[in-house]
Each structure stands twice: as structure tokens, then as C-alpha cells.
């Protein structure tokens, strides 16, 4: 009996070790055969340290499935890009003359029509409300650009006018002295040196101003009314004297 017990005790560790060995082999084989579950196997090394490794391998069938899925995604992307390009590509609306006249009159009434006004115009002109809205946006942009150009040109003209006003020549009262004071006469030369007639006319009395025009260096011609000639005055004085003498003789 004792020998049989010893034999059973000695056999138990071997059976347990065999069971554990079979269990671990099955686990390792299951992990190696099914790597998609993402499990990690820890293998004991000779020095007693554990290392982790992830096995990644795919079968040809899995590769084909992945390729087909990628192709499907690429086809869907192509369809999306085609639809977006079709949305971005809008047809240009050609307005008739009557439609443009109606739109222009509505724009003169209001630059920013509300939704109800746009819908009424669209129904009246047989257009889409979005087309009417786009036309008003473009018309407002054109109007703003025209106003900016107009304001810029008016400012330029105003600046030019101010510059011309500042550059205007000073005005002088009409007289011989003021004309001679203008810087047209060369410096360092007296007027009587080159223009003796002008100086002589300045020295004359008002009753002795000649009838000929006075010409200045710049070509300006001055004409003044001349008083009665001295001969006419002497004749008047002589006639008056004769009449007085005749009256005196009659009285005597």
C-alpha cells in the first residue's frame, strides 16, 4: 500500500505539468492563429525577464477586403468632389432688356430690398429669388465703385482749383506808379534811362498830358482822357475878354 501511495504521489506532479503544458500550448497557438484580437503574449526569457510582442499578420483574403474598402472610399470621395464642383458651377443668367429696366427702377427705389420685395420682383420677372439677390449685390458693388471714382475725381479738381487760386497774380490799382512798380522793369535801370517818355509824362501837369498812348515794357497800353487843349482855353479867354471890352465901351 505504501509503495502504491508513493507511486501516485510521484505521478501527480507529472500529470499537472502535462496539463499546464498542454494549456499553454493551446493558448499560444490560438494567439498566433488569431492575431486580429490585438492580444499580447508574454514570453519568459532565459534570464527570467518577460517580453511583450504583438503579432501582426494578415491573410490574402483580408488584404483583398481592405483594398475593396479603400476603393469604395475613393469612389465615394470622387462622387463628393463631383457634386461639390457641380454646386460651385453656377449658370450665368442672361437678363432681357425689360427685366433690366424693372430691376434698375427697383434699385433706384431701394438699394437694399427685403425678402418680400425680392420675391415679388422674381415672380413678376419670372426669375429665381436668388438670381434677383445676386443682381442687387452686383449692382450695389458697381454703384459703390462709381461713387468712389466720382468722389476721387472731384477731390482732384478741387485741389487743382485751390492751387490755381494760390498761384494767381496779385492785382494792383491802375496808375502809372503801380505799373512802374511791377518787377517787369529790369533791376538797376531807372525808367528814365531806357524809357524817357514815361518819365517825361510823369513830370507833366494834368493839362499837358499828350494824346499818344504810353507803352510799358510788358506791352501794356494805357489810354487816359485828355483835358481840353490849351489853345481852346485861350480862345475862350480871348472871347470873354472881347465881350467885356465891348460892354464897357457901350456903357461909356
Swiss-Prot record:
Q: Name one GO cellular component term.
A: nucleus
Question: Which organs or tissues contain this protein?
Answer: Specifically expressed in all A-type motor neurons. The A-type motor neurons class includes 24 motor neurons; 9 DA, 3 SAB motor neurons that are generated in the embryo and 12 VAs arise after hatching in the first larval stage.
Keywords tagged on the record: Developmental protein, Differentiation, DNA-binding, Homeobox, Neurogenesis, Nucleus, Repressor, Transcription, Transcription regulation
Primary localization class, coarse: nucleus
CDD domains attached here? homeodomain
Q: Name one GO biological process term.
A: cell fate specification
- Ranges for region Disordered: 43-68, 143-164
One Pfam entry name = Homeodomain
* Basic and acidic residues composition bias: residue spans: 155-164
Effect recorded for residue 188 to D/S = In e26/e2307; unable to crawl backwards. Abolishes interaction with unc-37
Presence of the UniProt keyword Transcription in the record? yes
Annotated region of DNA binding: 88-147
Instruction: Tell me the GO molecular function terms.
Output: DNA-binding transcription factor activity; DNA-binding transcription factor activity, RNA polymerase II-specific; RNA polymerase II transcription regulatory region sequence-specific DNA binding
Q: Where is the composition biased (Polar residues)?
A: 43-59
Similarity section: Belongs to the paired homeobox family. Unc-4 subfamily.
How does this chain assemble?
Interacts with unc-37.
Q: PANTHER family in the record, alphabetically?
A: HOMEOBOX PROTEIN UNC-4 HOMOLOG
Name under which the protein is recorded: Homeobox protein unc-4
- Which species? Caenorhabditis elegans
